[in-house]
Regions:
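Active-site rim/loop-helix segments in enzyme catalytic domains that contact anionic ligands
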Residues: 1-95, 234-240
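Metal-dependent de-N-acetylase/amidase catalytic core
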Residues: 2-6, 82-243
Length: 243
């Protein structure tokens, strides 16, 4: 299956937390979207690899994504190495997305930083014909996506653009809450973590409100790009005429 957008995440729930509204907006518009989780999140304090797998499947159904894979790399060890790099290259070549998303490269979690580096390097090397990868024992052709965008996790950055998710914020939160072992559940007997506190979901909404405010909308999600982006001035003027 050829995808329009492919999102790479260190752990199940990272994509939903960071850009769940954007994912819902894309799939609602008919775009084909996939998520590749690098690890099963087995080092997480709450839940297990098995429960998070089921939760990830449920969240993906809520967001109506077309593909979800888990590379089953070692949680807590997502650092650059050739094996991990080639697995990511293989997924890029398999799904041939126009755009890929990765965690922002400055973050408090080492796995997020490692995932960011791996995806950036994989994007470049996926276009080189002399780097060989296989999928189901078939040699893959080189392919390089058009753009790499970074989504926001712990640390903020000055966005290259903000996506209006006002009509999709509720869907995002429903997908986030599909990870019921990870977030607040008054009936849970597992140890409390930062993200399982009741206030964490309020933090999530506050960030979305903050970036929505910056673009004059109710809710927004922020993204970064290391390259300059083309600005469609004519399209903006034409859309303004319709309002």
């Amino acid at each position: 299956m050829i995808l329009d957008v492919l999102i790479f995440a260190a752990h199940p729930d990272d994509a939903e937390l960071s850009m769940g509204g954007t994912i819902a907006k894309l799939t609602s518009a008919g775009m084909k979207v996939g998520i590749i989780d690098l690890s099963k999140g087995e080092l997480g304090t709450r839940g297990s690899a098995e429960t998070r797998k089921k939760e990830a499947q449920n969240a993906g159904e809520i967001l109506r994504i077309d593909v979800r894979e888990n590379l089953e790399l070692k949680d807590g060890s997502l650092k650059f190495n050739d094996e991990y790099l080639r697995k990511i290259i293989s997924r890029i070549r398999k799904y041939q997305p126009k755009i890929i998303f990765a965690p922002y490269f400055n973050d408090r979690h080492p796995d997020h930083i490692g995932t960011s580096q791996l995806v950036k390097e994989a994007m470049f090397f996926s276009g080189l014909a002399k780097i060989n990868t296989e999928d189901n024992e078939r040699i893959q052709m080189p392919f390089r996506p058009q753009k790499l965008f970074y989504y926001m996790q712990t640390y903020e950055f000055k966005p290259a653009f903000v996506v209006d998710i006002s009509n999709f914020f509720e869907t995002k939160m429903k997908a986030v809450k599909a990870y019921d072992t990870q977030f607040h559940n008054p009936e849970s007997k597992e140890p409390e973590t930062f993200i399982s506190q009741p206030i964490f979901l309020k933090y999530l909404e506050a960030r979305a409100v903050s970036y929505g405010f910056k673009i004059g909308k109710e809710y927004g999600e922020a993204f970064y790009c290391e390259e300059e982006l083309e600005f469609d001035l004519i399209g903006l003027l034409k859309s303004a005429e319709k309002k």
